[in-house]
Amino acid sequence: GDVYKRQAIGKSENMVCVASDALAMAHLTRNVIYLKDGDFASLNRDSITIWDRSGQRVNREAITVSSAPSLIDKSGYRHFMEKEIHEQPDAIAHTLSAMRESSSIEEKLADVSNLVILAAGTSHYAGQIGRYWFEHLAGLPVSVEVASEYRYRHPAHEKGGAALAISQSGESLDTLMAMRHASKLGLKSVGIVNVPESTIAREADFVLPTRAGPEIGVASTKAFTAQLTVLFSLATRLGLKRGHLTAAQVDIYETILRGLPGAVGQAISQFESVRTVSQYLKRAESCLFLGRGLLYPLSLEAALKLKELSYIHAEGFAAGEMKHGPIALIEDGLPVICLLDDHELSTKTISNLKEAEARGADIILISTQSAAEKVDFAKHEIVIEDCNPVISPVVLAIPAQILAYLTAVEKGTDVDQPRNLAKSVTVE
């Protein structure tokens, strides 16, 4: 059978240690041996002996991992999550550099008939946003699957498809097993991971790295925006290769990408302005998040961030779905948080907000400047500078993260290690 919890053996001059993640041993050693499926090992202070599943003694190569101790320090911030929010401009810039180094990936995927995105949690919401980009920019049919469900299904895929497995750790069991399932069904596999030594990175046919650096906080921030950066860049390059975009259009999108670290940095500069909203929100027992188009999946991610950090019940909905059921939840004082940009459909979203406000909801806007100017009935606003709507999920993710973080701080919860959660989920 498969190893359901990958083991890493760390070795230094006078000690041996074992963990499921090399990051846990970064303060002790950077020399790591990864066991393969079926391996078992005998350890003592001076030696490591490994046998494979057949009982044969084997040598497994030690590698030097990239997570230096200096990278897992809070660097003066109160929490790792706060630090990681502030690291996002650099994480995006480094990821863009990595994508430029992956210059042939569109050649390898140019002839795929469809994409299947496999992921869990925050990575799944990144995949949902990516679906819009692949459809719009590359003309590719895309399905986004919950990894824990996909691995037990018998999906009917067109021949010539590819599976994108998205995982910060590269060790998420459900995503790994879903990727293996997709490979057995004949799909090419592409891993989008933040840990280059991970199992998904080793087993995927192709790898697109996010270079966000070690992410310690359980609630993902910089890995999420780095994943979005990879997905957007890949979509534009596939769009050009498949003839769906012109070179001139791709140049425009490349310019947008080059400006992304700066746009994200500007959004982070609004950090303290979010505090007033968090002081209001900490008293809520429940709230709704709304978004439309690219911002619908971001509303799901924003709701996840708030619930996992502050333990406030939060649900995300497509704004147009409010009238099909969720509007029954509206009562006086219920916070309804809307992610809004100046898109061609923004007037429809504003109409949905008016319906909620008329029934007693407290409207909170997380929006770009020009979109905010169209709304005069919000109780609170978190406003960032305008950006191209095609990339707004990356930029608007920042104030959503800050709101969840500061609300949790106001409530006094364990921000970096929320209850009942783990950073890398390696069990079923």
Where are these regions (language model features)?
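Catalytic P-loop NTP-binding/switch module of NTPases
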Residues: I48-E107
